């Protein structure tokens, strides 16, 4: 019993230690825009995203700022919060990132936790990969915050940046799962050794259709799940495609630089348990019916044979009748013989012939 309580206390301490530590992986800054991942998974809510950017002396970027950063090389393979949207900036098509689309890919989903994207107005206008060594707007707290830069350098600080009590003590312990096509930041070549993100430039083959194309047009075909598609426009007049999270089926679309087609894994329909149980019961009933039918056939199949012999009775009965000139009375002898009896029909025929011969001899003697 003491061992159980000791292990429980040790496990509780480990849980508290894990909850008291936060790792923040950040990318380079592109026109002030950078991506932040918390604890290696989607675990940042919308309110925490704003607090985290504020701790970095930054804000959530707008769509125009995202487009400007993408134009100079900013792209990721994970969803992140911006002002009013959840997006992935893509420059090169990749089948596991943003459904093989390019541009600022907007997601519409019910999932509430993602990464975040921040914008620092004081950052250089181009690409800046210098290490971040401070969390200037973090206040005092018991949490150990570690900033992991793209080059592997780390900066650790005690403090807190979250202001929403639900973010500090979430009611749901398990983190929300990301969409199927963005389970990680990409292949190992697309991630840095420190756990952050590297900007990758992977050129995939692009198919150019012969028919005219509309920019950023999407259509759903052969879908197995319901998806919501729409479009939004920013004040500058640009049009962005909005997609729902795709978990199965196929989608295809054409873009400004070509058409890209992505295919998701087809999900096999799940067989209900009640249907399996019903099929098992029916099979069992069929087997029992066959057994009962075979047993009944064996019982009813024991046929009985009637062997009828015409005889005239015993010797004593036949003598007076023969002397008096009366007609001999015939007597029928009926033998019931089972099909499985040890005596064969030939034996019965032999006995009958013997009796008939005796009758004939007696008549001749009289």
From Swiss-Prot:
Q: Which residues carry this modification: Phosphoserine?
A: 296, 321, 330
Looking up Gene3D superfamilies in the UniProt record yields: Mannose-Binding Protein A, subunit A
Per the record, which residues fall in region Required for interaction with EZR, MSN and RDX and for co-localization to microvilli?
297-315
Question: SUPFAM superfamilies of this UniProt entry?
Answer: C-type lectin-like (SSF56436)
Report the InterPro entries cross-referenced here. Answer: C-type_lectin-like/link_sf (IPR016186), CD44_antigen (IPR001231), CD44_antigen-like (IPR043210), CTDL_fold (IPR016187), Link_dom (IPR000538)
Q: Supply the alphabetized keyword list.
A: Cell adhesion, Cell membrane, Cell projection, Disulfide bond, Glycoprotein, Membrane, Phosphoprotein, Proteoglycan, Receptor, Secreted, Signal, Transmembrane, Transmembrane helix
Instruction: Respond yes or no to whether keyword DNA damage is given for this record.
Output: no
Domain Link, by residue range, is 32-120
Post-translational modification remark: N-glycosylated.
S-S bonds: 28-129, 53-118, 77-97
Q: Which residues carry this modification: Phosphothreonine?
A: 314
| Tissues expressed in | Mesenteric lymph node and liver, not in heart.
Q: Which residues cross the membrane?
A: 274-294
Q: Where in the cell is it found?
A: Cell membrane; Cell projection, Microvillus; Secreted
What residue spans carry the Basic and acidic residues bias annotation?
Answer: 156-165, 222-231
Q: What GO biological process term is on the record, naming one?
A: inflammatory response
Q: What glycosylation sites does the entry record?
A: 25, 57, 100, 110, 120, 185, 222, 260
Q: What does this protein do?
A: Cell-surface receptor that plays a role in cell-cell interactions, cell adhesion and migration, helping them to sense and respond to changes in the tissue microenvironment. Participates thereby in a wide variety of cellular functions including the activation, recirculation and homing of T-lymphocytes, hematopoiesis, inflammation and response to bacterial infection.
Free-text domain note: The lectin-like LINK domain is responsible for hyaluronan binding.
What protein does this entry describe? CD44 antigen
Q: What is the lineage of its organism?
A: Eukaryota, Metazoa, Chordata, Craniata, Vertebrata
């Amino acid at each position: 019993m003491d061992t159980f309580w000791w292990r429980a206390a040790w496990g509780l301490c480990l849980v508290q230690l894990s909850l008291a530590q936060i790792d923040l992986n950040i990318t380079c800054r592109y026109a002030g825009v950078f991506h932040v991942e918390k604890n290696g998974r989607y675990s940042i809510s919308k309110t925490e995203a704003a607090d985290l950017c504020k701790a970095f002396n930054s804000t959530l970027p707008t769509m125009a700022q995202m487009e400007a950063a993408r134009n100079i090389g900013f792209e990721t393979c994970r969803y992140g919060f911006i002002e009013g949207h959840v997006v992935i900036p893509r420059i090169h098509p990749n089948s596991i990132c943003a459904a093989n689309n390019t541009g600022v890919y907007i997601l519409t989903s019910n999932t509430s936790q993602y990464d975040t994207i921040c914008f620092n107005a004081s950052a250089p206008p181009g690409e800046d990969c210098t290490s971040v060594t401070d969390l200037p707007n973090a206040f005092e707290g018991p949490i150990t915050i570690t900033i992991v830069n793209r080059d592997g350098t780390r900066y650790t600080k005690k403090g807190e940046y979250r202001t929403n009590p639900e973010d500090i003590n979430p009611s749901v312990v398990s983190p929300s799962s990301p969409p199927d096509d963005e389970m990680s930041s990409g292949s190992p070549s697309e991630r840095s050794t420190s756990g952050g993100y590297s900007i990758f430039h992977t050129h995939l083959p692009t198919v150019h259709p012969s028919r005219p194309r509309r920019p950023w047009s999407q259509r759903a075909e052969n879908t197995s799940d319901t998806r919501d598609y729409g479009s939004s426009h920013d004040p500058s007049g640009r049009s962005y495609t909005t997609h729902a999270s795709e978990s199965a089926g196929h989608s295809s679309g054409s873009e400004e630089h070509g058409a890209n087609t992505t295919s998701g894994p087809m999900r096999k329909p799940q067989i209900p348990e009640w249907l399996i149980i019903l099929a098992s019961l029916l099979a069992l009933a069929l087997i029992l019916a066959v057994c009962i039918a075979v047993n009944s056939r064996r019982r009813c199949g024991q046929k009985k044979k009637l062997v009828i012999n015409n005889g005239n009775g015993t010797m004593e009965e036949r003598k007076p009748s023969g002397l008096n000139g009366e007609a001999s009375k015939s007597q029928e002898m009926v033998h019931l013989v089972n099909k499985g009896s040890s005596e064969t029909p030939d034996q019965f025929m032999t006995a009958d012939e013997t009796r008939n011969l005796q009758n004939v001899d007696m008549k001749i003697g009289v």
